[in-house]
């Protein structure tokens, strides 16, 4: 609970308050900017938020199991930052997004990446 950067996990609830959760704003919130109350330091992933997952005792056995994906080139990172239209992206880059399960998140990767680069 202490590790949640926005206080979305509280002692008196057994659920996560989605309206305070960084993952909600990274993945579902349809606006170009994050709310002012979310500090830039709260962001830690291009999609989602792993702080609660990383410290959860139930995850100890599994937390080190992750998918190693290819790195994005400078050119590919520029595609993301400039929000290049999906229809204009090179096919190998689209396949890389699909392999990393990021294609469905492409529309807001630019916003999410920019806040990580601050």
Q: Where are these predicted regions, by residue range?
A:
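Short amphipathic alpha-helical segments, especially helix-boundary/capping motifs
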Residues: 29-32, 86-92
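Long, compositionally biased charged/polar accessory segments in the mid-to-C-terminal portions
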Residues: 89-97, 101-118
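Alpha-helical adaptor scaffolds
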Residues: 76-86, 97-99
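Short linker/helix segments within small regulatory modules
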Residues: 33-40
């Amino acid at each position: 609970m202490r590790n949640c950067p926005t206080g979305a996990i509280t002692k008196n609830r057994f659920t996560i308050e989605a309206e305070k959760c960084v993952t909600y704003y990274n993945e579902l919130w349809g606006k170009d900017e994050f709310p002012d109350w979310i500090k830039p330091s709260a962001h830690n992933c291009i999609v989602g938020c792993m702080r609660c997952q990383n410290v959860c005792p139930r995850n100890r056995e599994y937390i080190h199991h992750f998918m190693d994906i290819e790195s994005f080139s400078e050119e590919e990172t520029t595609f993301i930052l400039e929000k290049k239209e999906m229809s204009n992206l090179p096919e190998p880059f689209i396949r890389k997004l699909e392999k990393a399960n990021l294609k469905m998140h492409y529309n807001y990767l630019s916003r999410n990446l920019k806040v990580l680069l601050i």
